[in-house]
Amino acid sequence: PVYTENADQNLTNLPYFKEANIPYARTHDSSICYDYGGEHTVDIINIFPDFDADPYSPESYDFTLTDMYLDNIARSGARVFYRLGNKIEHWPKHYGIMPPKDFKKWAVICEHIIRHMNEGWANGYNRGIVYWEIWNEPDFNNKCWTGTPEEFFDLFEITAKHLKSCFPEIKIGGPAVCRYNADWLIPFFEEMKKRNVPMDFYSWHCYSSKVEDFIRDTRLHRALLDRYGYNECESILNEWNYVCGWSGEGWKKSLATELSIKGAAFIAAVATACQHEKLDMLMYYDARINSTMNGLFRPGTLEVRKGYYPLKIWGEMLSSDGECETLC
């Protein structure tokens, strides 16, 4: 959501968020958006810019614009789903997606971000943020993680165990994989099981032009969780949208469809289909107001697009605490 107390250029979409009863806002890629605080927001390298600094000192952290951004999410009525890590980097030079120099120190930094947000540390807040996600798409072709899979397995283990020992009451999970890739996922789950790594939720992504692909992947990911003993772990699809191709005319058609009535119908269809699967949460990508994949809000004016309405209707059903049956 966008909100500012400036005297000018102060358009907001908070009323639309409230009306749609959107339950969660995920913070991933928020640092790509100037209106959210840009390169001073959410990501570990933005909040803790000098990795050689003291992670136990409040002076090492810059929470200012992240706090403002999370305040706006609270104003919208949504709860925060916080991604610990860094935004995607499509550039030829990378800045925040390399393996941290010290995995344990990185976990301690994450700990103090949570303490600031939930326990008031460093002039902080008591936001009660429950979901804390470790990284994003570590399996995605050096755009989110430049290290090896084995290095990521170590980072995930160290961070999950440390955070769970500090905060047993919150939910720790991840790693927001970009797709169902058994060659990456099976070694990940084998290591997590062998090392007894706690995982309260498991997050994953799916982009497709076919509703049945979302059903298929939901079942595949759930089967992996159950196979490796994570039977009580939540399965969360927290990036999804209509995509029929990632380049050329396919990508052009994808973006056009996301803004169309067909894109809106697709949102409703996927949400409805997944309602009948063993899936705990869906998070549409993207409501970021400068994103070309945003089928909900127009850039600049922040007026709603067609894709907003199925989410609004879903929010109404969420308030009724039950699925609505239609008789034809």
What are these regions (language model features)?
Residues 1-31:
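Boundary/entry segment of secreted carbohydrate-active catalytic domains
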Residues 76, 166, 228-231, 277:
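Helix C-cap/helix->beta junction micro-motif
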Residues 5-14, 64-68, 116-119, 187, ...:
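Short alpha-helical segments and helix-capping/turn motifs at coil-helix boundaries
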